[in-house]
């Protein structure tokens, strides 16, 4: 007769969880940030709001974003005028879009990750799906399982309405699943479509306007597992530790509420200040056990909530400008894609490291950090170890 301890030991993986593949996707419709204010005020029938349009132009200019991808085309918006209004009942129309398109966009990213991984999809044991774009039953995890043709026995976990920190959450969860289930291969998918938050401008709700200047659509997928088969699988990053915390005195700093008018977005002015004030504490807690105190010795993957957050974090920690290069690149090319952003940055970092001939996947460095920030204010901190190129 075996003991529970023996069974437990046999169930666990030996080594740390590793990211084995990354895939990303966006809708085809690309919007240029420099011309977006004209388009946005025209499509929402708001051109009479001249001063507000000038304000929005300045927001877009300061955003450090060159372009974004959006499922909502001019044609779709013309067919759904309530989505273009500031506060018109429109949840049904938004839901009809996202419950179909969120899993579809996730499928494109997942297929790329599975292709890079190079193993049959029947080996996927777990699915973790995250979106802040709409809710449904059965969820986007179920729809993706069907779209990809995964095994009906795949163990699914669906996270709705977590917001911008959730790219860190899905990695933390997948790490625990991979390390506690021998042979587990976890497909992680974040898929975000701004059809839930798009709305016309209003003088009374400038934080909503900030969202209209920043948010873009995108999906990203990872394959995560422990003890990679050296003949068949190629690790990209090892996941060393993962933590979540709620920042003190930050209640109400970022809120979202699902209403008849869609998902409303509320933002306090001092979000960058709150994050930069507390970020060093999170870093110390994560890296003290490793004896690391030089934040410039790390490679950095930070959720690009907006340029002000990145600027204040950089200043507070005295980071060299190149530390947030991959993060700023993704913000510039895609905008803020909520939970998917940090996965896009991981992809950008390993590709740029390879292209530049650096000797690790983390810009030639050994240790790195991944930060997710979002409603709460909630912060996810993941310690990464790069892999030799």
Curated annotation (Swiss-Prot):
Catalytic activity: (E)-4-coumaroyl-CoA + 3 malonyl-CoA + 3 H(+) = 2',4,4',6'-tetrahydroxychalcone + 3 CO2 + 4 CoA
EC class (word): transferase
InterPro entries: Chalcone/stilbene_synt_C, Chalcone/stilbene_synt_N, Chalcone/stilbene_synthase_AS, Polyketide_synthase_type-III, Thiolase-like
Pathway it works in: Secondary metabolite biosynthesis; flavonoid biosynthesis
Any Pfam family the entry gives: Chal_sti_synt_N
Function: The primary product of this enzyme is 4,2',4',6'-tetrahydroxychalcone (also termed naringenin-chalcone or chalcone) which can under specific conditions spontaneously isomerize into naringenin.
Name listed for the protein in its UniProt record: Chalcone synthase E
Source organism: Ipomoea nil
Classification lineage: Eukaryota, Viridiplantae, Streptophyta, Embryophyta, Tracheophyta
């Amino acid at each position: 007769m075996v003991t529970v301890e023996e069974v437990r030991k046999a169930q666990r993986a030996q080594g740390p969880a590793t990211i084995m593949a990354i895939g990303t996707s966006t809708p085809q419709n690309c919007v240029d940030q420099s011309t977006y204010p004209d388009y946005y005020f025209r499509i929402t029938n708001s051109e009479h709001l001249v001063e507000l349009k000038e304000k929005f132009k300045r927001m877009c200019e300061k955003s450090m974003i060159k372009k974004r991808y959006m499922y909502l085309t001019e044609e779709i918006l013309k067919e759904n005028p309530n989505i273009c209004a500031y506060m018109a009942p429109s949840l049904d129309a938004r839901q009809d879009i996202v419950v179909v398109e969120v899993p579809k966009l996730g499928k494109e990213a997942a297929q790329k990750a599975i292709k890079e991984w190079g193993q049959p999809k029947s080996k996927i044991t777990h699915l973790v799906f995250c979106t802040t774009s709409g809710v449904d039953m059965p969820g986007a995890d179920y729809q993706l399982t069907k779209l990809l043709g995964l095994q009906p026995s795949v163990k699914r976990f669906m996270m709705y309405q977590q917001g911008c920190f959730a790219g860190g959450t899905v990695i933390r969860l997948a790490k625990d699943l991979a390390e506690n289930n021998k042979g587990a291969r976890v497909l992680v998918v974040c898929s975000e479509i701004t059809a839930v938050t798009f709305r016309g401008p209003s003088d009374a709700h400038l934080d909503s306007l900030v969202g209209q200047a920043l948010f873009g659509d995108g999906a990203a997928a990872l394959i995560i597992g422990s003890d990679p088969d050296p003949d068949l699988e190629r690790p990209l990053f090892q996941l060393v530790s993962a933590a979540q915390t709620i920042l003190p005195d930050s209640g109400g700093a970022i809120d979202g509420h699902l209403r008849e008018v869609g998902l409303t977005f509320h933002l306090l002015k001092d979000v960058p200040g709150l994050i930069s004030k507390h970020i060093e504490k999170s870093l110390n807690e994560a890296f003290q056990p490793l004896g690391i105190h030089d934040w410039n010795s790390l490679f950095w993957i930070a959720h690009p909530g907006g340029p002000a957050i990145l600027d204040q974090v950089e200043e507070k920690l005295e980071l060299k400008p190149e530390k947030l290069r991959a993060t700023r690149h993704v913000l510039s090319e895609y905008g803020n894609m909520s939970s998917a952003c940090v996965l896009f940055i991981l992809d950008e970092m390993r590709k740029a490291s390879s292209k530049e001939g650096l000797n690790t996947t983390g810009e030639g460095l050994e240790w790195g950090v991944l930060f997710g920030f979002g409603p709460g204010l909630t912060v996810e901190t993941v310690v990464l170890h790069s892999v030799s190129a």
